[in-house]
Curated annotation (Swiss-Prot):
This is Integrator complex subunit 3 homolog. Signal peptide: none annotated. Residues 1066-1077 have a biased composition (Basic residues). Its main location: nucleus. The gene is IntS3. Keywords: Cytoplasm, Nucleus, Phosphoprotein. The lineage of its organism: Eukaryota, Metazoa, Ecdysozoa, Arthropoda, Hexapoda. Belongs to the multiprotein complex Integrator, at least composed of IntS1, IntS2, IntS3, IntS4, omd/IntS5, IntS6, defl/IntS7, IntS8, IntS9, IntS10, IntS11, IntS12, asun/IntS13, IntS14 and IntS15. The core complex associates with protein phosphatase 2A subunits mts/PP2A and Pp2A-29B, to form the Integrator-PP2A (INTAC) complex. Residues 942-953 have a biased composition (Low complexity). It comes from the Eukaryota. InterPro entries: HEAT_Ints3_C, INTS3, INTS3_N.
């Protein structure tokens, strides 16, 4: 009996639980579930069968006790969440009996949402929204806590119906009760941060109405409450970048960049936001509570090496849909800024943060999400200030690269490439500040011994050469560490490497042309750059296997360092201790130094006005200044300020003229101070003093674009001056460019190729525009220069090829000369197919005779050089066969199945000049068998230069044999019936050994017998030579020739693989034809 009662009670409990939670047979009830069930059962027992008045009276008595008050409140909440019909009446009952302003109900509802929202039934979730609306409507205290936890349950990367319902329901509450929302600044910040993040996931056309509602609400709230939005800081900017192509957000971006005061009087622009570290509570609100618990467990309880099964579970649970990839950025930002392990954990065998982040990045297969994940990893580097930022925020970035370089070099190389390019292109206007942030990060990493040194990473042989060069350009202060001298890695005066101008399309972020209107914008690394791009401009990241165990880095934390400066940032993150003792040895900008009177005034004016006129005036004074007039400190001061001003005054985009013809655009494009230096050098070619040479050397070394901008300047300057004074000729002075090369102590050829390579990468159109001038003015260097040729070939399309050929045809451009062209072609054999086809088009445009390149014929292989062979075959078609061409052609290696190139050439020549071709080949074959030594082959002497390209008798016979096989049905067989070929074949037969006779028996069978030679198995007659036939026998001779031809046709109509015995059946008994006089080679 007791067992039956227990079973009934269990069934009753399960029935009650099933109303609120989705349970399975294996689920065990936890404390929260039992608490709600117990409260509901207790309430039902107390009010069962009572009228409303009786119920209110008895409950009023019970709620006087604290425990019973909580139990009754939870019981009512249970009814509201499970019974929609009774919810309004129950809510009125709560208001009557509650004695704490519903504080207990709100607290328990907050706990329920945070811990059990995923297990709530659909009815319970809908009733949750209903009760929240009632709470907000009646302004119940602390309801914002429930709202905030509901916002957390609105997960990113989730477009399921369940999640979309929650998102839209919360949005409707915010819109309807906007006035209440604005009374809570933290909830305003959380809702804006959350919805800007969620809008990114709602790009599907099916969600357009929801997305438009979200955009309208979010933009309105941002603009109306921008003073509450400012504390969201730099991560809010990161989220805004992902939605920047939506028209409403595009307008917001323009106000942030160009009209910040219109948003709020205290707002100073984008850098104002980027300097504020985002509070970890906002980063936390973008993770589901359950996901946060799993992540904490992974980072605090799982041993390194045992993490794979947990990662697989996490992957299947949260990354199962295409939309879920965007969640990786949220996870990485949370790990970096919220999960800060203690020193004990760092020294333990628990999986480190960098390994989790490495797994998140390497397992991402979506290119946009992958780029955003990398940005999330390095985001704090870009704005790092040692005085107030935590080293724990930059530590994972360096460790994931450092530990991956050995076993996963692809991960390290892609991250390094991303870091280099984002440093230049994230915010070009403030590149110096961004670069300083990255410099501070790397310096603190070394100071705190996060890793011993950067050399194993930056100089790893597993990085390709281009990436190592990029690292040297961006982090030259850290590239060459010296053993036992760590301070040598940090120069006394910090210099910031100048940016290399990227193509204009790569410089749209945070500039005049910032973004396109549209949806679904994303941060993508393109051609190695980081920017807002269209959806079709992506980089695919291949997934890698999970990170394997490697040696961990042990480094000291900053928690024991005393704090000596107040953290001015208003944040509730009390464990982010400022590192005030970590300082740069010197400030980036040197302090003012007194200069000699000769230059002090002009330099001060230049520093103040920063224009070309004041710059040239200073150069005029500085050029003649002797070395003794300046000490090292003064010279460094001049150089540092000069380089900084020259770089800052150059435009960040559109550095070249918009038009190649209009004077105003041309003049404007060379009006900047750097061009003033070029103008000064152009007009003053006399040798200058050492300080000026040092200044010039430093400018060229730090501003890598100096060389190609000088070439551009000379083109424009000569063009403009010639228009002003047509009677005077203005030269494209190569001497000025030589000065630049001498200043960098490099050969002019090396400098020219490097500068033109940079120019092509910056702007292909300008590169091709300058090309004729380069080949004209630097002809000794440029003509037949394979490196310059490769730069040109890699960037041209069909229209460019056409324009270059126009210039060649008009005599404006000469790329090749005959001497040395052969070497150019040999180097080009490794180029891409399209590049080789373009090359041959240009060679053809130069009217290069075949004799200049015919030496290539024996070298080319059919399998490896199809492009060159195709064009050479076309050239051969336009030529008559000569002794030299045939010699080279037949020198080609004859494969077992023949050489189609040789066969093709012989075939089309046979159609035009069969007899001449036959005589040339016959003469070549005959020359291999001297009459003085009938049984030995003639071998070329060791000193003969033509030995390597002179065909042997076997070569010639091989090609003739393969040609014979190609002649089906008697076509083309006339090559063998001419007198000289007949004699040559007979001579070859008589001088060949038995194996050769057997190998070429079919070929030798084509030769008619004469009186002195027997071919094949035919016996000789032993008779002397006949007298030539007279005119009266001419008809007989013609008949004989015809019969001979018929025999040849009969032979070729048979199977080409016939045996020697088969050939012996064809007896050729005609007398030999009248011999023609041998043709001289000169013919």
């Amino acid at each position: 009996m007791e067992q039956q009662q227990q079973q009934q009670q269990q069934q009753k409990s399960v029935a009650h639980i099933s109303k609120l939670f989705v349970c399975t047979a294996v689920d065990c009830k936890d404390e929260i579930e039992e608490k709600f069930e117990r409260s509901y059962v207790s309430l039902q027992q107390q009010i069962a069968g009572l009228s409303d008045k009786e119920m209110h009276d008895i409950l009023t008595q019970f709620v006087c006790k604290e425990k019973q008050h909580e139990e009754i409140s939870i019981g009512f909440l249970y009814i509201i969440l499970t019974d929609p019909a009774m919810a309004p009446k129950t809510y009125r009952d709560i208001t009557l009996v509650s004695r704490d302003g519903m504080n207990v109900i709100v607290a328990n509802l907050t706990l329920l949402v945070a811990e059990k929202y995923a297990k709530l039934t659909e009815t319970a979730r809908r009733q949750l929204i209903w009760v929240l609306r009632e709470f907000v409507k009646h302004q119940v205290l602390s309801v914002e806590n429930v709202i905030w936890n509901c916002l957390r349950q609105a997960g990113g990367g989730d477009v399921s119906h369940k999640n979309l319902y929650l998102v839209e329901s919360l949005l409707d509450i915010f819109i309807e009760y906007r006035a209440w929302l604005e009374t809570n600044p933290f909830l305003v910040q959380s809702s804006v941060y959350s919805f800007v993040r969620l809008i990114e996931d709602h790009a599907n056309p099916a969600l357009i109405s929801l997305r438009q509602k979200e955009v309208k609400f979010t933009i309105s709230l941002i603009r109306d409450r921008f003073h509450d939005i400012i504390p969201l800081g730099r991560d809010f900017v990161r989220l805004l970048q992902n939605v920047a192509r939506i028209p409403e957000f595009e307008l917001l971006w323009r106000d942030i960049l160009y009209n910040p005061k219109s948003l709020h009087p205290t707002f100073n622009g984008i850098w104002h936001l980027l300097q504020i570290r985002t509070s970890r509570r906002f980063l936390q609100c973008r993770l589901l509570p359950e996901m946060e618990r799993k992540l904490h467990f992974l980072a605090s309880s799982v041993k390194f090496g045992n993490q794979k099964r947990y990662q697989d579970w996490f992957q299947d649970k949260y990354f199962a849909t295409p939309e879920s990839h965007s969640l990786r950025s949220d996870l990485i930002r949370f790990i970096i800024n919220v999960i800060h392990p203690t020193n004990d954990m760092l020294c333990s065998d628990i999986i480190p943060r960098w390994a989790i982040i490495g797994w998140l990045i390497s397992s991402c297969t979506n290119p946009i999400a992958s780029a955003n994940a990398k940005l999330s990893l390095f985001y704090d580097w870009l704005f790092f200030d040692p005085a107030k930022d935590n080293i724990m925020n930059i530590e994972p970035g360096i460790l994931v690269m450092y530990h991956s370089i050995r076993n996963h070099p692809f991960v390290s190389s892609t991250l390094l490439d991303f870091l280099c390019r984002i440093t230049k292109n994230f915010y070009v206007k403030n590149e110096d500040r961004i670069r300083l942030g990255v410099y501070n990060s790397l310096k603190l990493i070394l100071d705190k011994q996060v890793i011993p040194n950067l050399h194993p990473l930056f100089e790893s042989p597993k990085l390709d050469r281009e990436l190592r060069n990029l690292i040297r350009e961006n982090f030259r202060e850290f590239v060459t560490p010296v053993a036992n001298m760590p301070q040598s890695m940090y120069p006394a005066t910090h210099t910031i490497q100048a940016p290399i101008f990227k193509k204009e399309a790569d410089q749209r972020l945070m500039q005049g042309e910032i973004m396109d209107a549209g949806g679904g914008g994303a941060f993508v690394a393109s051609s190695g750059t980081n920017m807002l791009v269209d959806d079709d401009n992506k980089i695919a990241i291949a997934p890698l296997e999970s990170m394997e165990r490697e040696n961990e880095a042990v480094f000291s934390d900053d928690e024991n360092l005393p704090s000596t400066s107040k953290n001015e940032e208003n944040t509730d993150d009390d464990d982010d201790l400022p590192l005030s003792k970590v300082r740069l040895k010197e400030k980036p900008v040197p302090e003012k130094v007194e200069l000699p009177d000769a230059i002090a005034e002009s330099f001060e004016i230049f520093v103040t006005k920063r224009n070309s006129f004041t710059w040239e005036a200073f150069l005029k004074d500085f050029r003649t200044l002797p070395a003794s007039a300046l000490d090292e400190t003064q010279l460094n001061y001049v150089i540092s300020n000069t380089v900084l001003i020259l770089r800052e005054t150059l435009p960040q985009q559109n550095v070249f003229s918009e038009s190649k013809t209009e004077e105003k655009y041309l003049a404007k494009s060379i009006s900047y101070p750097l061009y003033g230096l070029f103008r000064f050098l152009y007009e003053n070619e006399d040798k200058s003093k050492k300080p000026f040479q040092t200044l010039l050397s430093e400018i060229c070394g730090r501003l890598t674009e100096t060389g190609y901008l000088l070439l551009y300047f000379m083109k424009i300057h000569c063009k403009l001056q010639t228009r002003k004074n047509a009677q005077q000729s203005y030269q494209f002075k190569t001497t000025v460019y030589r000065q630049i090369c001498e200043a960098t102590d490099e050969k002019i050829g090396v400098c020219l190729v490097r500068d033109l390579d940079l120019l092509e990468k910056e702007n292909t159109t300008i590169y091709l525009w300058l090309l004729p001038d380069i080949y004209r003015e630097f002809k000794t260097i440029a003509i037949n220069n394979t490196e310059l040729l490769r730069i040109t070939l890699r960037c041209i399309d069909a229209k460019n090829v056409r324009d270059i050929m126009y210039s060649i045809a008009q005599g404006k451009l000469t790329i090749f000369k005959q001497d040395g062209l052969l070497d150019c072609i040999r180097d080009s054999l490794e180029y891409e197919t399209y590049e080789q086809f373009c090359l041959w088009q240009l060679i053809q445009a130069h009217d290069v005779p075949l004799k200049c390149i015919q030496d290539l014929l024996p070298e080319l292989e059919a399998a490896n050089h199809p492009e060159a062979l195709s064009h050479l075959l076309l050239l051969l078609k336009n030529e008559e066969p000569t002794n030299e061409i045939i010699r080279l052609l037949l020198s080609r290696e004859a494969k077992s199945r023949g050489d189609p190139f040789v066969t093709s050439a012989l075939r089309f020549w046979c159609q035009r000049c069969e007899e001449k071709l036959s005589e040339i080949i016959a003469s070549l074959l005959t020359s291999k068998y001297p009459s003085s030594s009938p049984n030995k082959r003639k071998r070329p002497s060791k000193g003969s230069s033509a030995a390597s390209s002179t065909p042997s008798a076997d070569h010639v016979l091989n090609h003739l044999e393969h040609y014979r096989r190609s002649c089906r049905h008697g076509t083309g067989t006339g090559l063998y019936v001419h007198d000289m070929m007949q004699r040559a074949l007979q001579s070859a037969y008589s001088h060949s050994n038995e194996s050769t006779k057997k190998q070429f028996s079919d070929l030798f069978a084509l030769a008619a017998e004469d009186e002195t030679t027997a071919v094949g198995r035919r016996g000789g007659s032993g008779r002397g030579r006949k007298q030539p036939v007279g005119k009266k026998d001419s008809s007989n001779h013609s008949a004989s020739s015809k019969k001979n031809s018929d025999v040849v046709k009969t032979i070729y109509s048979s199977d080409e693989n016939s045996s020697e015995e088969d050939w012996s059946k064809h007896k050729v008994t005609q007398p030999a034809k009248k011999r023609k006089k041998a043709i001289n080679d000169s013919d």
